């Protein structure tokens, strides 16, 4: 008997106000970590109408022009016209930045790199599945690709009436756990006032949705909802306040996996909210790529100032080819999940973070995304005593 279910994930464009804030936070981090790899950064941003407020705790020997970094980021996104109500040339930039608490420094710094203590307590999840060629859930993968396509057509001038703010939502139909069709696709995009709704709908379906979605998933039952409220001229930080760290499900697995609650952007890799989640994805992806399971979720947890994880757990949702206890043993044998070793293994002390702030931190194929490597898949497969796996990444 066929078991049919629906699952939905959403994504947002680089011009969405929360993503504007994420990009500012990570742009500041990149500017500092490139000069001072041992900097400690926790940088938050709030954006609204004509103002950006940047705040946080930063301890570093480097210097960065936070105001200019903020303006450049806003302009690069596409908010470069006063008529939009928010632009990088004229917006006010207010900063309130202090230093990291010395109580935290005691537990994190001043040790050998491999014994670097976790920057805070917390729990993180990593996930991978065989649904897509990038070992990610299909709904979030295609939701990201839709808003990336919107940005591409906006920036290259093919659809000049597009504006920076946009959201996508993809509902896929699953049969026996595998995606087989698109049930509903929502694409809401900010636009200039002169474009008609009829022309906008036609262009979005033909130029954004159809080139991205697999054609065999689109049938007579697929619903296309383009700007469902009609007009979307006012958008970005004029329409909504944006805040760093408010799109944590968009940043990860679109709701297909659990989330520990900590955001990524604006945090240097001593913060395990970020580095621990990246490592958990690295572990889960190698387990799936190695053929040990078709789906895998890893949980890892830490205590502030302590290097060793307080727990590691594995869930394979009944798809494991070997016992989960054995998978957990293999993780401990082949992955060092102390923060200092994660940073070293994944080469995280680099200016790579602004690129992660849009279109998801996982399922990316750019070389900077070192946690997407499957270099341990074959090692895990052999250690598990399994036949050759089909490793595609």
Swiss-Prot record:
Cofactor: Mg(2+); K(+)
Function field: Catalyzes the formation of S-adenosylmethionine (AdoMet) from methionine and ATP. The overall synthetic reaction is composed of two sequential steps, AdoMet formation and the subsequent tripolyphosphate hydrolysis which occurs prior to release of AdoMet from the enzyme.
Gene Ontology, cellular component aspect: cytoplasm
PANTHER family: S-ADENOSYLMETHIONINE SYNTHETASE
Reaction(s) this enzyme catalyzes, per UniProt: L-methionine + ATP + H2O = S-adenosyl-L-methionine + phosphate + diphosphate
Record's keyword annotation contains Transferase: yes
Region listing for Flexible loop, in residue ranges: 100-110
Alphabetical keyword list: ATP-binding, Cytoplasm, Magnesium, Metal-binding, Nucleotide-binding, One-carbon metabolism, Potassium, Transferase
Gene3D superfamilies named in the record: 3.30.300.10
Segment forming the signal sequence: none
Organism of derivation: Coxiella burnetii (strain RSA 331 / Henzerling II)
Chain positions recorded as ATP binding sites: 16, 165-167, 231-232, 240, 246-247, 267
Cofactor note as given: Binds 2 divalent ions per subunit.
Protein's name in the database: S-adenosylmethionine synthase
Biological pathway: Amino-acid biosynthesis; S-adenosyl-L-methionine biosynthesis; S-adenosyl-L-methionine from L-methionine: step 1/1
Sequence positions that bind L-methionine: 57, 100, 240, 271
InterPro entries membership: ADOMET_SYNTHASE_CS, S-AdoMet_synt_C, S-AdoMet_synt_central, S-AdoMet_synt_N, S-AdoMet_synthetase, S-AdoMet_synthetase_sfam
